[in-house]
Structures are given as structure tokens and as C-alpha cells.
């Protein structure tokens, strides 16, 4: 049933009020993106890239890094690799290829330097992008309750001292391995 002329349908009025409130709300600015307070902004990179071309960047920062990129003009896509300094859409470990904002979280265990490729999508002659590089200082919890990052600030590669029980179990394991090897040898000789 159509609404009488001169009077808008109730849902149209509600929709207009909702859109107006979204536009006028202070936190709706597209330029301001919310980030957790544990993140530290390291760099802001702006650039231009032609259609079908790559622009390459190198990341040397250690730790968990978050890349947030938005296309100011056109459509730029993001490719990341720990094994190649020139990642592409054929050779990458992480990627974000959306028509909107792109984001990639680079784990702390990725070997540095990390290669970053920004690809200009061929649907636009030229793309402009802005990439924000954040250090993610959040501490992830280990599934068994231990922190993923050492709490005392020790080097992540530092090994913890072994308990005496671990040493005796390791010795016992070596002895069993030797015993089984000798038994296999004896069985091969006999049969």
C-alpha cells in the first residue's frame, strides 16, 4: 500500500534520521581510524602507483607490525613476504586486495627484512595510497596460559634453563634409541 502523497512513509523518515545522525556524529570521520592504545604509529607512507605496477618497500622493524593502507585515489593492493623483497600477487605470504581499506598483520616471527609490495590495480590508470605502519605492543596469551612475549624483557630467542627431570628423561631416551638400534642390527645379522 502506497503512502499518501505529501507525507513520507515512516521508515523513510527513520532512515533519513539515521543517516543524518551518522554524518553528524563526531567519530564518523573517515580520516580518523580507531586503533588500540597498545599500537604505536611508526611511519606514514604516501605514494602513487601506475596501473599494473608495483611499488616496493622494506620493513626492518622487529616485533608484530600492522600495516593499514587506504587508497586515496584508484585501488592499491598490499602484498607482503618474508622470503622475497619483491612480493607480487603470484609470490607472497600475506595479502590484502580489497576495493576498500587494506590491512595486514605481520607476525613477529617473520624474518626481517620483510618485503612489501603495493600493486596498482589495472582498473585505474593511477592509484594513490597512504599506509600507516604500527607496532603492535599487545601481549598475546599462550594457549597454556604463558605470555607469548617474555614478561621480563628477555630476548625472545633465549632458552630457559632445563629442569633436572628433563635431563634424565633425555638421557633415558638416548639410551632407548641406542638399545633399539643395536637390537635391529642383531636381528638383521641373524635373519
Swiss-Prot record:
Keyword Secreted: yes
Family affiliation: Belongs to the UPF0669 family.
Cleavable signal peptide: 1-30
Primary residence: secreted
BP GO terms, sorted: apoptotic process
PANTHER family from the UniProt entry: UPF0669 PROTEIN C6ORF120
Gene Ontology CC terms: extracellular region
Protein name, UniProt field: UPF0669 protein C6orf120 homolog
Function: May be involved in induction of apoptosis in CD4(+) T-cells, but not CD8(+) T-cells or hepatocytes.
Record's keyword terms, sorted: Apoptosis, Glycoprotein, Secreted, Signal
Disulphides: none
InterPro entries: UPF0669 (IPR031420)
Subcellular localization(s) per the UniProt record: Secreted
Residues of this chain annotated as glycosylated in UniProt: 53
